[in-house]
Amino acid sequence: MTSYLLKNITVLDKTSEHNGKKVNVLIENGKIAKIGTAVEDAAAETIDFSGSYLAPGFCDLYVNINDPGFEYREDITSVANAAIAGGFTTICATADNHPITQSKAQVEYILNNAKNTPVSILPIGAVTENFDGKTPTEMLDMHYAGAIAFSDVPHSVKDSGVLLRALQYVQPFDGLIITMPFDKTLVGDGQVNESEVSVRMGMKGITNLSEYSMVQRDIELLKYTGGKLHFVGISTSESIDLIRKAKAEKLNVTCSVFVHHLVSDENEVKNFDSNYKVFPPLRTKDDQQALIEGLKDGTVDCVSTQHTPLNIDEKNVEFEVADFGIIGLETAFGLLHKKLENEISKEKLMELLSANPRKIINQTASTADFIILNFDEEWMLPEKNIKSKSRNSPYLNTPLKGKVKA
């Protein structure tokens, strides 16, 4: 296999003794073999990476792989190609497949079919059978088969007793429960954020209360049970305040926000572009700023894409009947860096995309989990270059800053 000598590349990894240094890196068989200022190899193909950075690959805690059951939207091969194009070397696959990932056999199906892909695809098992919110799954069996965590996303666990028992059940094997907090009875038929924008559009709104009321409930359950709880898709300022307080009380709680909530707000839906129809909905600018402040002070642990492939019949229809969802693996880095380059450091962005999500699921990056980044490159992603099978993104052909080079 060809060896490569990457010259004059800057290391961006807080765990490395070379962090912040310009080095040469020898790559053999796809792994880092040597790294240092004096590394040379006459037999290797030499590439000058002046101005670029060597960093651990990104990790996404919320990806819909759609395999098995919805392969017309995405499959394991296509999602792996989309992930690696966006710099993600590890992705966590939600249980929202058909059949739902709720047994040892279904966990093994994903792991076996992902073996020959360029990324690590880690299955998340369901908390309740068929997402019914009532009947617990065999979480222990799935854990031993390789499930990385347990979640009913895109649903919330509506029954408090079920979530309480799940938090207790997974503690002996240090399991993680992931939840997307929302009260379905308060969401109803809502389409967009409840505000002046929803009124002007004539659309039913989704209140902040529908989210933060469940955050409050889940935190109280965590106080009672102990264990570990991760909130995905936090979108409101009130939720951020509650999680900040819970962390101050030393509860074992973490949270992530979605890329689109950081880079877009509710004003994007005014023109009824269904590609901006996501759940939770895009919120106000004040909510968005609260999320950014949460990134800065550590309330928000990481950023996820909520990669949700949908085909044209599910998305390019009237706004009210369009499905919720957006693809995001390939544009995440360019969107985030463009939006946040004056708000957070490069090191902080790497924590949010790489170190922290791995810490939440007790994973570490291997010597093969590296990517090469150029923070200054401006580019756009045309539809013809998308690796995903689906095209449901409002960020195609829009200016991005920061590109994954390899």
Regions found by a protein language model. Name each.
Residues 1-41:
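N-terminal metal-binding scaffold of metallo-dependent hydrolase/deaminase domains
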Residues 9, 318, 367-406:
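C-terminal cap of metal-dependent C-N hydrolases
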Residues 9, 30, 51, 62, ...:
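Divalent metal-coordination and catalytic microenvironments
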Residues 38-54:
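Active-site metal-binding motif and surrounding structural segment of the metallo-beta-lactamase
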Residues 50-114:
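Metal-associated gating/positioning segment near the N- to mid-region
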Residues 113-126:
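A glycine-rich helix N-cap at a beta->alpha junction
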Residues 137-303:
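Histidine/acidic residue-rich metal-binding segments in metalloenzymes
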Residues 200-226, 296-297, 302-304, 308-373:
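His/Asp/Glu-enriched, well-ordered alpha-helical/loop segment
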